[in-house]
Amino acid sequence: MGFLFGLFIGIAVSFGLVVAFARYSSVRSTRRADLAKTIAAFARMTVQDSRKLLPGDFYPSWVVFSQRQKLNWLNLELEKIWPYVNEAASELIKSSVEPVLEQYTPAMLASLKFSKFTLGTVAPQFTGVSILESESGPNGITMELEMQWDGNPKIVLDVKTLLGVSLPIEVKNIGFTGVFRLIFKPLVDEFPCFGALSYSLREKKGLDFTLKVIGGELTSIPGISDAIEETIRDAIEDSITWPVRKIIPILPGDYSDLELKPVGKLDVKVVQAKDLANKDMIGKSDPYAIVFIRPLPDRTKKTKTISNSLNPIWNEHFEFIVEDVSTQHLTVRVFDDEGVGSSQLIGAAQVPLNELVPGKVKDIWLKLVKDLEIQRDTKNRGQVQLELLYCPLGKEGGLKNPFNPDYSLTILEKVLKPESEDSDATDMKKLVTSKKKDVIVRGVLSVTVVAAEDLPAVDFMGKADAFVVITLKKSETKSKTRVVPDSLNPVWNQTFDFVVEDALHDLLTLEVWDHDKFGKDKIGRVIMTLTRVMLEGEFQEWFELDGAKSGKLCVHLKWTPRLKLRDAS
C-alpha cells in the first residue's frame, strides 16, 4: 500500500513539474515575442516620436535633441579635398571680400586690403544639416548647415592710416561657429533641377580672432585695433548675414524675386540717455549715438554731440529701411567724442524688430553693454531711451504715422495727391534716403498734472512741499503747479495748455521740486516726446521719476491739432 501511494505521489509531482515547465516556457516565449515587438517598435521610432511619448523630465540632463542630422561622412571627404579647396578658394575669397572691406573702412584709415590670404590646413567641420520644410515652399528647397571652424589661416591685412603709415596686421586664432542657409530655388525640369543657389549666414553663434602687428604692437596706435575689429565684424554682419543673401545663377533666367527687398520703414527717435559711464579723466563725456539696422555707411545715422554731459538729451529722428522684420534688429551705440582722436565706446544695445507692433509707438529704455555678443557685462554703462514706430510697406494708409509727409496734408491735399507717388516697393529706398520736405505739425497740447505718489522725503519732518514745473523744450515755454505742502502723495489736478509750433521735434519735461523758504530742491523728472499723444489723441499714465529714489507722477495729455503746414527744404 505504501509503495502504491509513493508511486502515485511521484507520478503526480512529475506531471505537475512537466505542466509547470510547459506553462513557464509558453509564458517566456510570449514575453520574448512581445519584447521583440517592443524593441522593433522603438527601433522604428523617430526622435520626434520619443519626444511626444515621453515627458521632458524623463531624460537625463546630458541628453540633447538636435534638429540636425550628423555629417561625419561629409567631414571625412572634406578633409581629403581641403588642400585643393585651399588652393582654389583662397584667391577667389580674397578678391570677393576686399571690396566688402572697403565699404566698411573706418574714417581713420586710408585703405584696408589683403596682402596675404590662405585658408590654412585645417578644414571646417559640419556638425549638422536640416531641411526646413516650412521655409522651402512648393518651388524650392531650404537647407541649413551648422559649421564649426577653428582654423589656422594665414591672413595679413595691409592697413594704411591717413598719415600714410603702412601697417601689416595679422589676423590670428580664428574661431567661428555658425549656421549657413542654402536655398535651391526655383525648382525646374532641367538638370541640375534648380535655377539658382542663394546662400547666407543664418546665425553667427561665435566669432573670435586676434589682431597683431607684424614686428610691433597694435596698442602703440590708439584706436586702430578696435576700428579694424569693428570693421571685420560689421562686414560679416552686413554682407552675408541673413536676411542678406548672395545669389548664384545656375541656369539662365531672371532671379530678381530672390533678391532682398524692403518690407517696411522704421522711424526711430533717439530721445536721451542717462547715467552714462564717464570716459574722460577731466570733466564729463561728450556723448553721441549712432543707430543702424545694417551697418552700411549710408544707412548709419548719427546724432549731434552733447558736450560735458552724462545725461544727454538728443531728441533726433531717423528713418530706416526694413528688409526682414522677423530677423533684423536695430542697434544703437553710444560714444564719447574725443575730437581729433578716435571716439571711445560707452556702450551698445539692440532691439529685435519682431518685438514691434506695426503702427504702434514703442517707448523703450535699453541698458548699455560693452559687447552685444557676450552679454556678460555687469558694469553700469547707462541707459538710452528710444522711440520706435514700424510701418509695413503697403499699409501706410491704414496706419497713423506723424513722421510721414502725408500726415501733414489737409483733407483736400490728400484727395488731390496722386496715388502712385512713392507707393511701390522699389521706391522705398528713395523715399527713406532722399531729402524730403520737413513735416511741421502744429497744435495745442493740454497737460493735466494729476498727482504724484511715494515721493522721497526731503524735509526734516519726513515730508515734501511738492510742485511741478512743465516745460516745452523747443518753444522754451514754462508753467508750474501750485505747491502742495507736507505730502508725499500730492494731488494737483491742474491743466495747462501749450501752443506747439513743431510737435515732432519738441520735448515735454515735467520736473518735480520741493519748495523751501530758502530755496528749492529737485526731486526728479519725466521727459517724453509728443509722438504718442499725436497718434492716440489723449491718454493718461503713471510715469516713474528719473533721478529720484522713488516716486511716480500721473499725467493726462490731450492733443488738439491745428493747421498743418509743409516747409519746403
UniProtKB/Swiss-Prot annotation:
In terms of domain of life, where is this protein from? Eukaryota
Residues bound to Ca(2+) 2: D459, D514, D516, D521
Alphabetically sorted, this entry's keywords are:
Calcium, Lipid transport, Lipid-binding, Membrane, Metal-binding, Repeat, Transmembrane, Transmembrane helix, Transport
> What is this protein's function?
May be involved in membrane trafficking.
Query: What does the record list as GO biological process?
Result: lipid transport
| Name the record gives this protein | Synaptotagmin-4
> By its UniProt entry, which Pfam families does this protein fall under?
C2, SMP_LBD
